[in-house]
């Protein structure tokens, strides 16, 4: 029971499916031919021998013939004595790797299906072909396959050569680009280095100047600190001296005031002892005493002014003024009208000389 093509059995179809090349899916391995195919090939060979081709194509198998002999063979009509034998075109299409589908289409035609039983009877009558022809045919098929493989290999080699050339060209172009980029980068790096050198030189000069300025600033700061310390000490010393001066002036004023009080008391005691009755003389004495007191107060005020100014530190002027003032009251005292008054007046200048030691000690105190 043949389900597909009548020329193959189910076992042969399974074998064909199992023997497919995984690396070459488009090509099929050579398959054992049936008796019908062998008979057709044998008839084709006989026909070619009868025709007697002059170009030597009769010695070759139909698969190895070029297009021109195939066209000639297809153009020639089959002899009327063999109606069961198909034309060479159908035989050539039924053989080879990619010719199985053509044979199947021819066998499935309605005319061939009707003559199927007649071909079987012819197969029984015809003898088996020689094994040598089949071997030659297989060798030729292998050679043709080898040539195809060689051609494919050559094509692949050419493609690889082209790819290598393109790759080398791309590499050369890329290398040129990289060289140009490296040159640009080197130039930019040199420019940056030059800028860095200029900036570093300027920075070095500025740093040296900054160091020098910082040293000068430190020296000036030290001098300022010393001057400030001296100023503070001088100010404190000035304050102490002013305090001592004020204390001395106050002491001088108190001494002068006490001296004047003592003088007044002494004069009163002398007047009581003498019991002066004359009113005129008493009035004159009182006037003289008041005048002396006023002069002493004015002198004390004049002495306070130069002490505060500190323009005349020595006390020679003060002592001279005190001596002059002490001499001035002696003039009216030297001309008394009576002996009592002369005694009193003679004793008064002696009492007026009492503040002289205090006045003499004043310049020494101020100098200290």
Curated annotation (Swiss-Prot):
<dbReference type="GO" id="GO:0005737">
    <property type="term" value="C:cytoplasm"/>
</dbReference>
<dbReference type="GO" id="GO:0005794">
    <property type="term" value="C:Golgi apparatus"/>
</dbReference>
<feature type="region of interest" description="Necessary for interaction with RCHY1">
    <location>
        <begin position="188"/>
        <end position="368"/>
    </location>
</feature>
<comment type="similarity">
    <text>Belongs to the GORAB family.</text>
</comment>
<dbReference type="GO" id="GO:0005730">
    <property type="term" value="C:nucleolus"/>
</dbReference>
<dbReference type="GO" id="GO:0005654">
    <property type="term" value="C:nucleoplasm"/>
</dbReference>
<keyword id="KW-0333">Golgi apparatus</keyword>
<dbReference type="GO" id="GO:0031069">
    <property type="term" value="P:hair follicle morphogenesis"/>
</dbReference>
<feature type="compositionally biased region" description="Basic and acidic residues">
    <location>
        <begin position="11"/>
        <end position="27"/>
    </location>
</feature>
<feature type="compositionally biased region" description="Basic and acidic residues">
    <location>
        <begin position="129"/>
        <end position="138"/>
    </location>
</feature>
<dbReference type="InterPro" id="IPR007033">
    <property type="entry name" value="GORAB"/>
</dbReference>
<dbReference type="GO" id="GO:1905515">
    <property type="term" value="P:non-motile cilium assembly"/>
</dbReference>
<feature type="coiled-coil region">
    <location>
        <begin position="145"/>
        <end position="304"/>
    </location>
</feature>
<keyword id="KW-0175">Coiled coil</keyword>
<comment type="subunit">
    <text>Interacts with RCHY1, RAB6A/RAB6 and SCYL1.</text>
</comment>
<feature type="region of interest" description="Disordered">
    <location>
        <begin position="298"/>
        <end position="368"/>
    </location>
</feature>
<dbReference type="GO" id="GO:0005829">
    <property type="term" value="C:cytosol"/>
</dbReference>
<dbReference type="Pfam" id="PF04949">
    <property type="entry name" value="Transcrip_act"/>
</dbReference>
<keyword id="KW-0963">Cytoplasm</keyword>
<feature type="compositionally biased region" description="Pro residues">
    <location>
        <begin position="77"/>
        <end position="86"/>
    </location>
</feature>
<protein>
    <recommendedName>
        <fullName>RAB6-interacting golgin</fullName>
    </recommendedName>
</protein>
<dbReference type="GO" id="GO:0045880">
    <property type="term" value="P:positive regulation of smoothened signaling pathway"/>
</dbReference>
<feature type="region of interest" description="Disordered">
    <location>
        <begin position="1"/>
        <end position="138"/>
    </location>
</feature>
């Amino acid at each position: 029971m043949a389900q597909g093509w009548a020329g193959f059995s189910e076992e042969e179809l399974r074998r064909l499916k199992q023997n497919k090349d995984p690396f070459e899916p488009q090509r099929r391995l050579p398959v054992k031919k049936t008796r019908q195919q062998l008979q057709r090939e044998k008839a084709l060979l006989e026909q070619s021998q009868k025709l007697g081709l002059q170009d030597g194509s009769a010695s070759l198998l139909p698969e190895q013939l070029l297009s021109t002999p195939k066209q000639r063979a297809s153009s020639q009509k089959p002899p009327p004595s063999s109606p069961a034998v198909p034309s060479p075109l159908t035989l050539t299409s039924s053989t080879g790797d990619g010719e199985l589908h053509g044979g199947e289409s021819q066998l499935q035609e309605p005319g061939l299906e009707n003559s199927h039983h007649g071909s079987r009877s012819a197969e029984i009558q015809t003898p088996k072909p020689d094994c040598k022809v089949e071997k030659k045919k297989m060798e030729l098929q292998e050679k043709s396959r080898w040539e195809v493989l060689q051609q494919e290999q050559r094509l692949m080699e050419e493609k690889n050569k082209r790819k290598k050339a393109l790759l080398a060209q791309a590499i050369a172009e890329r290398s040129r680009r990289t060289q140009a980029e490296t040159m640009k980068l080197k130039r930019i790096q040199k420019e940056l280095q030059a800028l860095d050198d200029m900036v570093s030189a300027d920075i070095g000069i500025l740093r040296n100047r900054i160091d020098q300025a910082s040293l000068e600033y430190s020296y000036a700061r030290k001098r300022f600190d010393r001057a400030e310390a001296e100023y503070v000490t001088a100010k404190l010393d000035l304050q102490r001296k002013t305090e001592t001066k004020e204390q001395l002036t106050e002491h001088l004023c108190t001494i002068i005031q006490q001296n004047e009080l003592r003088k007044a008391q002494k004069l009163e005691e002398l007047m009581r002892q003498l019991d002066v009755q004359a009113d005129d003389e008493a009035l004159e004495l009182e006037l003289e005493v008041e005048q002396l007191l006023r002069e002493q107060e004015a002198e004390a005020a004049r002495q306070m002014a130069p002490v505060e100014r500190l323009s005349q530190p020595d006390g020679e002027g003060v002592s001279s003024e005190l001596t002059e003032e002490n001499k001035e009251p002696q003039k009216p005292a030297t001309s008394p009208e009576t002996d009592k008054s002369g005694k009193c007046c003679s004793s008064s200048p002696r009492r007026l000389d009492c503040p002289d030691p205090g006045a003499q000690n004043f310049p020494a105190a101020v100098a200290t």
